[in-house]
Amino acid sequence: MTELPKTPSFSLAGRRALVIGGTSGIGLGCAVALAEAGACVIIMARRKDMLDDVISAMMTAGFTAEGIVADISDIEAMKAAIMEIRPLDIFVNSAGMARHSPAIDTDPAQFDAVMDVNLRGAFFASAAAAQAMINDGRTGSI
């Protein structure tokens, strides 16, 4: 059987990619794909233990990776973290959470926690990444 090359069809060498929620699931897949294409990947996550494990694994695999601990539901802290890690060329917003309970059993605090991450956090993180790219005169991708 012919072995297919793993070389990406494009290069992101020299690009900086921020992946929010990149310690598991789709976010981790995106982080690895960006790193395979040559990007320096910065992963933002709220759980330091998971973040440290992922960054260590990526660096062991030969990728350039950094981690920053921030909670996307804390809008001001998240914005400050994004401004700290500039410049950015690529932003992947993959943070998300779910509460697994029937709608009739969901209380307002549970609902608000999900919306703070999945809606408010996603919106304001994207806006902060766009502002960082504008401030640095970079044309990026969100």
Predicted feature locations:
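Flexible N-terminal pre-Rossmann segment of NAD(P)-dependent oxidoreductases
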Residues: M1-R16
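Active-site loop of short-chain dehydrogenase/reductase
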Residues: R15, F63-T64, P87-L88, M133-I142
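Conserved glycine-rich cofactor-binding loop
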Residues: R16, T23-G25
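The beta1-alpha1 cofactor-binding region of Rossmann-like NAD(H)/NADP(H)-dependent oxidoreductases
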Residues: D49, V69-A80, P108
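A short, exposed helix-loop element centered on a Lys and neighboring polar residues
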Residues: S126-A127
